[in-house]
Design a protein with these regions (language model features):
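Bacterial Sec-dependent N-terminal signal peptides
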Residues: 1-24
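ATP/NTP phosphate-donor binding region
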Residues: 23-98, 281
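Accessory alpha-helical/coil subdomains and C-terminal extensions
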Residues: 25, 31, 55, 59-66, ...
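A glycine- and small-aliphatic-rich helix-loop capping segment at beta-alpha/alpha-beta transitions
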Residues: 44-53, 117, 123-136, 151-157, ...
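Short Gly/Thr/Asp-enriched flexible loops that form oxyanion-binding sites at enzyme active sites
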Residues: 111-133, 275-284
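Short, acidic/small-residue loops that bind anionic groups at enzyme active sites
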Residues: 122-153, 159-163, 288-297
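Internal gly/pro-rich beta-alpha loop/helix module
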Residues: 138-209
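C-terminal non-catalytic interaction/assembly regions of soluble proteins
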Residues: 272-352
């Protein structure tokens, strides 16, 4: 009997130890949206593929090591290439993340996402998630069937980042190819290279190495719990478009922006957000119609500054500061849910 009691006691202790280990690991939930990380190709050596084909359960099976660092669960939100990302999916993601964090039993979120518009989704969530818990976007430049696919290690590093206590309060981040990049500054810089995501204006926040995160800095821009924007009761976003400037641009490219219900226009200008003489009268007309105009630049680095070659105060234009056109569009959409005062919107661009 004594032997049986000892065996029972040992078994009970083993069960308790196992449950304690599970309980001590953070709970990480993965929201899958598709993209190259879930893509399949006809050949392991070719770059052509179909995005968004692999389910999240299959992706996790390829990286069993994540279960050693976290209790990982997942759900499929959509299965799309991120070139088809849209406002409806953004709103779904933001609301779902806020719902998960409100429950109290989720410690971090990982979002698998295509790289084409990842920086836009990350920035949108950076402004609409209402928690200081980690939200990490991750993708791949090579499909899951490719020789030397980058997705599995990227996914592992993303879970490591989301599970780390040090990641709290950093805002929404992108974890790609070993780097941890803040949503404000991250951008895709190469069409095919695995080291495509960089933060050329500010640098990476940190990196992941051997299953550990190392942070060197954090963003001073407002985000997440410090954000003014709330999408809880929104089912759509204001209509905002981007008009691209180039040599000999014709004024008629502005016609749809003036006639099709746009509430805001981001001008992707040359140099420091400069505007071609053919477009200037059309942008003035937009302001007269109550359409907000933000000046950004097609140049990948450097800010678009107030009152450089354009008198923004005179024309009531907003300068995007360090935000590229696609991110300026995101902030303008959210700003328009709060106000149409161009001066207040300029304040938003100064701090976000």
């Amino acid at each position: 009997m004594n032997g049986l009691r000892k065996l029972s006691l040992m078994a009970a202790m083993l069960v308790c130890t196992t449950w304690a280990a599970v309980a001590q690991k953070p709970n990480i939930h993965i929201l899958a949206t598709g993209g190259t990380i879930a893509g399949t190709g006809a050949s392991a050596t070719k770059t052509n593929y179909t995005a968004g084909q692999v389910a999240i359960s299959t992706l996790l099976e390829a990286v069993p090591e994540v279960n050693k660092i976290a209790n990982v669960t997942g759900e499929q939100i959509v299965k799309i290439g991120s070139q088809d990302m849209n406002d409806a999916v953004w709103l779904t993601l933001a609301k779902r993340i806020n719902e998960l964090f409100s429950r109290g039993d989720v410690d971090g979120i990982v979002i698998t996402h295509g790289t084409d518009t990842m920086e836009e989704t990350a920035f949108f969530l950076n402004l609409t998630v209402k928690s200081d818990k980690p939200v990490v976007l991750v993708g791949a430049m090579r499909p899951s069937t490719a020789m030397s696919a980058d997705g599995p290690l990227n996914l592992y590093n993303a879970v490591v980042t989301a599970a780390a206590r040090e990641s709290r309060g950093k805002g929404v981040v992108i974890a790609m190819n070993g780097l941890i990049l803040g949503a404000h500054g991250a951008m895709k810089t190469n069409t095919v290279d695995v080291q495509t995501f960089q933060s050329p204006n500010s640098g990476a926040l940190g990196y992941v190495l051997n299953g550990k995160v190392f942070y060197n800095m954090e963003s001073l821009k407002r985000h997440t719990t410090g954000s003014d924007f709330d999408v809880a009761h929104l089912d759509k976003l204001p209509k905002v478009g981007i008009v691209y400037s180039y040599s000999n641009v014709e004024a008629d490219i502005m016609t749809p922006f003036l006639n099709d219900g746009y509430q805001g226009i981001v001008h992707a200008g040359v140099g420091n957000g400069n505007i071609h003489q053919n477009l200037f009268p059309m942008l003035e007309k937009a302001r007269q119609q109550g359409i907000l105009v933000v000046r950004s630049s097609r140049v990948p680095t450097g800010p678009t500054t107030l009152d450089a070659e354009v008198d923004d105060n005179k024309y009531q234009f907003v300068a995007s500061q360090e935000l590229n056109p696609q991110k300026a569009r995101v902030l303008l959409m959210l700003a328009l849910t709060k106000t149409k005062d161009w001066k207040k919107i300029q304040e938003y661009f100064n701090v976000y």
